[in-house]
Amino acid sequence: SAYILSQGENILEQALAEEATALLKELENRTKEQPDAYKRPMYVGIYSVGPKLKTHSGKQIEELPHLTDVCVQEYAAGQMVYPAELLKNNVSGYALCEFTIDKEGVILRPHILKSTHPEFAEEALRIVKEMPNWTPALVGGKAVESDYTLYVPFRPQLYKEQLQIRERELSKKH
């Protein structure tokens, strides 16, 4: 949610409320399970989302990698197949998928950094593995390998609304 807001995009208040409620519930459960946990520092990891700004060798990327015809978040949302059981139970969450884009724009080594549910991780990997080639990053006018971390949100209400819109558009065409 914070990432979406930082990009200047809108997010439903309900989605923010659901995410905050889930985080509070998780914190409450963690406190019950381990009452002294707050005394020990806990590192969960903070991942920067989007393209890495430097190459593996440390050079500053001048032109970031991108999909040619569509924003990567729009592509992911359009390709998403929500796990049926999780959709039925209104389970929301996310997956963070990191991958490398090679000099030809081919995705290499996609892997999950973090996810709230194994099925969300599987779906995020499927989406990334099926992506078309990217326009690679450039340094000094030459294509270079670069890393990208994609945040894939799973919001059941939003997904259901998008399905309804698609169904209406399809029925208009027929």
Task: Indicate where each model-derived feature is located.
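Charge-biased low-complexity segments
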Residues: S1-H174
